[in-house]
Amino acid sequence: MSTVNELVNLVDETYDISQIEKEIGLDNIALSDLELLATGGYSSLTGFLGKKDYDSVVETLRLDNGSVWSIPITLPVTEEVAKSLKSGEEVKFVNGGNVYGVIQIEDIFVPDKEKEALLVYKTTDEAHPGVKKLYERPNVYVGGAIVLTKRFENNPFPSYHLDPIETREEFKKRGWKTVVGFQTRNPVHRAHEYIQKSALEIVDGLFLNPLVGETKSDDIPADVRMESYEVLLQNYYPKDRVFLSVFPAAMRYAGPREAIFHALVRKNFGCTHFIVGRDHAGVGDYYGTYEAQEIFTNFTVEELGITPLFFEHSFYCTKCEAMASTKTCPHGKEDHVILSGTKVRELLRNGEIPPSTFSRKEVVEVLIKGLKKEVVTE
């Protein structure tokens, strides 16, 4: 499988829904999944998973046909709604009074959520945000092919909201043969910058693709993060080598499995490489530091269709007076300033200003201003 894989396109705004009476209400996660299914972000999926594919993904990290897919993309409905549905019929998708699409129902089944939690998230602990969300959502899954009949009008970042076909076009226009994708749900701190620029030394372009779907409550809000990315790129990155666009999916916090998922999706957006750092898509202490890198050894680059780039934990070294990692710095822990999104968030929420070894001053200014605004509106 190469990176020029065929993109699924299931957007049809002329689709006749006038005769379809039944409807399924979508929550924000299902709504963002619907968009990514339709625009090809989740290629080769053509709909919400039926039982065969669901079981296969949960147990083997592959679809029933053998291709790699690590996160079950499911459509949960209540028992009450499920009783009114039957296989073979078309049902409308609604959210906030709008009809967004249609599903051709192929499957209605009750999943074993405990098994899903254990295999996908490696825990059944409800303190884990992914597990908590899994248990909170309804208990019956509906599988089937979808059509997106209406594009979302209220995207919070319209100029940065590009479909995979558009990002591929953009990379082509820029003449980029190799593109590295970077996934983030945090403001970019100096450790991220170091990793991104190290990767940029060996490829033509960097695709900064922050996730702006549903995240946990203590993550920094997407609008504040977007502003922080803008000032960072403006001041510290070569403009012709970086492209910023949002990833509208929800965060699953599934660690290693989500790292595979994030790589596959970035392949669909047109990336040839994908950065996997320490504890990618992790939360708390549920996953080992490099577990999200180790999981890639189960798959060949050919079947993934994208090359992962693994980076060690980086830090600021007071002796080197530079960003470094254990691969490039001989000094001991006492000389290392450890940077993390969690640490930056913590300092900011306590009203402390992160040092310049942590974050660029322009970024810090944006974050402080944004978080003050957030406190005022709460």
Curated annotation (Swiss-Prot):
Catalytic activity: sulfate + ATP + H(+) = adenosine 5'-phosphosulfate + diphosphate
Coiled coil: none
Signal peptide: none
Enzyme type, top EC level: transferase
InterPro entries on file: ATP-Sase_PUA-like_dom (IPR025980), PUA-like_sf (IPR015947), Rossmann-like_a/b/a_fold (IPR014729), SO4_adenylyltransferase_pro (IPR020792), Sulfurylase_cat_dom (IPR024951), Sulphate_adenylyltransferase (IPR002650)
Transmembrane annotation, as ranges: none
CDD domains listed in its UniProt record: ATPS
EC number: 2.7.7.4
Keywords, ordered alphabetically: ATP-binding, Nucleotide-binding, Nucleotidyltransferase, Transferase
Pathway: Sulfur metabolism; hydrogen sulfide biosynthesis; sulfite from sulfate: step 1/3
GO molecular function, one term: sulfate adenylyltransferase (ATP) activity
Domain of life of the native organism: Bacteria
Pfam families given in the database record: ATP-sulfurylase, PUA_2
GO biological process: hydrogen sulfide biosynthetic process; sulfate assimilation
NCBIfam families listed in its UniProt record: PRK04149.1, sopT
PANTHER family, A to Z: PTHR43509, SULFATE ADENYLYLTRANSFERASE
Family label: Belongs to the sulfate adenylyltransferase family.
Protein name as it appears in the record: Sulfate adenylyltransferase
Organism: Bacillus anthracis
